[in-house]
Amino acid sequence: MSMTVWEWFEQRSYHHRDFEGLGRSSGNGAERPSTTLIFPARNVAGTIGTILSVVQDLRARTGLPDQVIVVDADSPDGTADVARAHGAEVYSENELMRAYGPAQGKGDAMWRALSVARGDIVMFADADTADFEQHFVYGTLGPLLADPQLQFVKAAFRRPFKQGEDKILDGGGRVTELMAKPLVNLFYPELAGFVQPLAGEFAARREMLSRVPFFTGYGVEIGMLIDVFDQVGLAAMAQVDLGTRQNRHQSLANLSRMSSVVLRTVAAREGLGQRLDGGLGSGALDNGVPGLWEQPDTYLHAVATEEGLRIDEHLNELIERPPLASLTDDTALSSIV
């Protein structure tokens, strides 16, 4: 089924209120697909307990979700202990898929967590959300539970920005607005209807997720959006309005690094390095400068400080994990836990 972005926006945009019945029901869920909720977590002891309490209250009333996983980055702040105390299955990201070495960021943690997910439908959510509510869960899962033709649902929301006592209702999501959306409009205009293309909250059918690769770091969300689109097409994708979502804000320097990874991820999917290299095949421009996709994994960030000018070098590796369904090597499969 082919759809224009306008048709898709009208027909595949939902509101969490459309699925309030899921939040109020008390059935045992035997006839519906099973569900797994995964939280990639790093130093979120201050929020993960409250979030899991909300999830457990929903689970006690409705049976949603069937499985709750926290995959922790060996956080020194006690994130894992808090999560266990609130009833979650807790895994160290470095203990899953050990054949691939230490985990290399959020996307890698998500990929590894998928290996222990049992649900027919898998939902991911950020663990640093300050205003997590039950409708985040049933709203995101709802379209997939209601429509067997859908394969992927992305959360949409308003992103407030709070600085001191000042609050700008739509001031958050700076990487989304300044980098991701312009790139999507330029290279993937069919996906321009997604309000939050970088949202960490999304749900998908596990069988489909097992067929897509995962970028290991900040590129995981935009890379997955593109790869799911290539796998199932726009008509099998949807978004749901969750209202307002507030999470911790990053410094501009960190946002700059994130933006560079989003840019390189789209460049990788577009083969942009090959396009920039003038067809030389060596990955270099006529002047010897590497094409965009062949650029080194370091990101140079020049800043002016009170002490003077400084240039910082950051490692921004763009690593891609293979689809789980493609893994047939006994060593890789036996190292799941």
Predicted feature residues:
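A conserved acidic beta->alpha catalytic loop
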Residues: D72-A80
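Acceptor/aglycone-binding surface of glycosyltransferases and processive sugar-polymer synthases
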Residues: R98-K106, M110, F132-R206
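Conserved catalytic loops of nucleotide-sugar-dependent glycosyltransferases that act on lipid-linked
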Residues: D170-T265
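N-proximal low-complexity "stem/linker" segments adjacent to membrane-targeting elements
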Residues: M1-Q56
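Conserved donor nucleotide-binding strand/loop of the catalytic core
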Residues: D66, A80-D108
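Short aromatic/hydrophobic "clamp" motif used to bind/position activated sugar donors
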Residues: V122
